[in-house]
């Protein structure tokens, strides 16, 4: 993880919903126990631990509620940022034909087409969370989504599955981006 980018959460209770989420502005490459906060179903911290939850806590809660996910991971990579800008006006990005698609939970064939929705990055987190939650209810098969110019959100039943989804989707984004570049300009002679 680059610097303080991204945020991670794990569901610690379902009824009521509670998350352990990384605090804002901490290095995600060197997370310590003090960098993780407990939050309730409305996003407010529980307990007296220092730090503040990520501004994007509402998105983690929306995903945990809608997907009954056990973990939610948000990353900022070059490929998710660039491709979300290139395909933002299309509302999403289709990933298909790659063997690595089978690394996504429930996908059994490389012939699968994964739709990765792209949302405009919005500082009104409750409004954005509402749009994300509506999409997740309407599109139960998606494994993640992109925030335009920002990064990837994905989830899993547990932290290991969520991490696998990050790895698979980031691979697919890079492969798609390189293929698009090769189609437009020919193969990169320097890689």
What function would you assign to each model-found segment?
Residues 1-191:
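Glycine-rich flexible loops
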């Amino acid at each position: 993880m680059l610097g303080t980018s991204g945020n991670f959460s794990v569901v610690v209770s379902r009824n009521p919903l509670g998350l352990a989420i990384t605090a804002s502005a901490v290095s995600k490459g060197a997370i310590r126990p003090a960098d993780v906060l407990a939050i309730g179903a409305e996003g407010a911290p529980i307990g007296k631990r220092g730090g503040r939850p990520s501004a994007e806590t509402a998105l983690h809660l929306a995903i945990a509620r809608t997907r009954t996910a056990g973990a939610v991971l948000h990353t900022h990579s070059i490929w998710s940022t660039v491709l979300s800008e290139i395909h933002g006006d299309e509302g999403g990005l289709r990933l298909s034909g790659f063997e690595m698609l089978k690394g996504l939970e429930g996908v059994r064939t490389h012939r699968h087409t994964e739709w990765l929705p792209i949302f405009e990055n919005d500082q009104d987190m409750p409004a954005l969370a509402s749009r994300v939650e509506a999409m997740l209810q309407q599109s139960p098969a998606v494994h993640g989504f992109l925030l335009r110019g920002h990064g990837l959100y994905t989830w899993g039943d547990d932290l290991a599955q969520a991490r696998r989804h990050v790895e698979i989707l980031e691979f697919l984004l890079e492969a798609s981006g390189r293929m698009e570049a090769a189609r437009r300009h020919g193969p990169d002679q320097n890689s």
